[in-house]
Amino acid sequence: SRNDEVATCIRIALRDELLELMIEVNYLRRALIEKAGENVDTLIPGYTHLQHAQATTFAHQYMAHADALARDFSRLLNAYEHTNLCPLGAAAFASTGFPIDRAKTTKLLGFNSMLENSMDAVSSRDFIIESISCFSNLMTNLSRLAEEIILWSTSEFDFIRVPSEYVTGSSIMPQKRNPDYAELIRARAGTVCGCLMSVLSICKALPYSYNRDLQEVTPHLFKATEYTTASVLVMTGMVKGLELKKDKLEKQTQIGFISATELADTIVRSTDIPFRTAHKIVSRLAEEGKDRAEDEEEAESDVVLRRIDELAMKSIGKKLSEIGLTERKVKEALNIASNIRKRDVKGGPAKREVLRMIDRRKTDLDKDGRSRQVKEERVKRSLDELAREVKKKKRVIKVMKT
């Protein structure tokens, strides 16, 4: 029946696309990890609400993107397992009275297993929903990276230079370097999510078994697959060619009182006062000084300590310099590089910890690559066996005809 044949062909096509997409995702992961490895000492401002928050490193931030993509790879791997199931032999939906061997066709076509219930086999499209859901998640992660590239390449941020092959000019403005490719990735994330919503809406409330509505599902699948694979490929090239403006990045870590959290932490560690109290003191200090100090590390630590003492007297009735806080500790708290070194807990931005993560992620990446390759080779062996079976049958038919 066309019902089980079409379902089988869609699954074969999709499993091939999933295997190809997994390769591209791993290329992008490797590009991010390598770019991080080149910049473990590159200081950058970290943001919350797009406001200066705490200092981190470029490597730490790009490893965050790589980790998100590692989860995307895992989801694609799971989607492959649910896709690579064989519906062939289900016929229209009630199977057949002929003595077919469904297990044999399942094996020869490279499927992991068969969809046993013949009605489920022809009417289910949940594997498509799952796959496009994975694509949507992946594209959402790519859109965050794309948005970052777009922002960081603006004149206002000016942190990076996007490779020339991924920007376009203007028909009338000679100076323009528009990050069009990143913008298209950002936009296509919405398109892929739209494909998911369309397929969910089509499949909702469909009665068993087959309905022609399902014909409308496949175009959304192919569009989502094409957009996702192309976006990953383009992003890989863009990441590889990014040029960092390290001086500008580091300069941005010196403004906006980005060391405020570490100063509050230092006060707590040195004096044992409650963090809420330290937070209140440093918050007041930030309100007074954030517009005056263009370079935090140039601020005189003795001046900062005196002002902290004044604020502490108003808040708790004692000077913090009398209960453990020193000028040296204040100076160290205001030092951005020192801030980073202290954050050496698991997953933190300290160099030693980031290098450990990079090493571990490379190992994970190699392992994931092997997992994908095993699946691809299994399919190839099955199809080779199928080709041999067909060749053998042809010889038998030829002999019988003679």
Regions inferred by a protein language model and the residue ranges of each:
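Glycine-rich cofactor/substrate-binding loops
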Residues: 173-402
